[in-house]
Amino acid sequence: RFIGLFLLLLAVSILLYFFFTLRKTPTVTQTPIEIINTYTNSVDGFSIAYPKTFTLDSGYGYQGFGPQETIRGVSFVIPLAIATGTNLGNDSYISVEHIPKITTCTIGQFINLTQGAMPYTIIDGGISYLVASSTDAGAGNRYEETVYVREGLTHCYAIRYFIQYGAIENYPKGLVVEFDKPSLLSAFDTIRRSLVITQ
């Protein structure tokens, strides 16, 4: 009888020990470290930070107005891992573009306003931007562009978000998932906010 009582008390003690020990053990959340690179263009007078997983294209030129009106700049193409398994095109990117030697800078110099783009102004982090977006489609693909033109500068700079993706309804069911657009835009926003104009 006493042995049974002793064993019962021992079992209860062990359970209480593990219960309070586990409660006091902190849970450690592993936060991925984003390695950042900085691109500096001393000729065009700007620098910008971007994740190391993005691909830098310093020979980038925007040709939305035709090859004769190429806007020079630099682009940062999304990592393949973001697009894999989704309907997002792996050629989506964010770019910094600069039009030199002009006295008046307008958003219409960076995006075709005849396609329904309606400019508006935002203030983000104390910086004023003129913003306009456009969409296009072809062969089952969708193309979205949003341009941010920095206001109040003596030189003409813009940041472009270019997102290409396939219409999700055109894929066999279960083949891909719809890409996380808010997360992608958040990543682009972070890069945009890091732009520093040095001239």
Model segments located where?
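N-terminal Sec-pathway targeting helices
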Residues: 1-11
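Hydrophobic single-pass membrane-insertion segments
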Residues: 16-28
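N-terminal "mature-domain start" segment
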Residues: 28-73, 119-127, 195
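Active-site beta-strand termini and strand-to-loop segments that position acidic
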Residues: 41, 78, 150-152
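A structural detector for beta-sheet-dominated domains
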Residues: 49-51, 57, 77-79, 97-99, ...
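Surface-exposed amphipathic alpha-helical segments
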Residues: 53-57, 162-199
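Short, surface-exposed polybasic-and-hydrophobic patches located at secondary-structure transitions
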Residues: 65-88
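Signature of long, low-cysteine stretches enriched in small and polar/charged residues
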Residues: 87-170
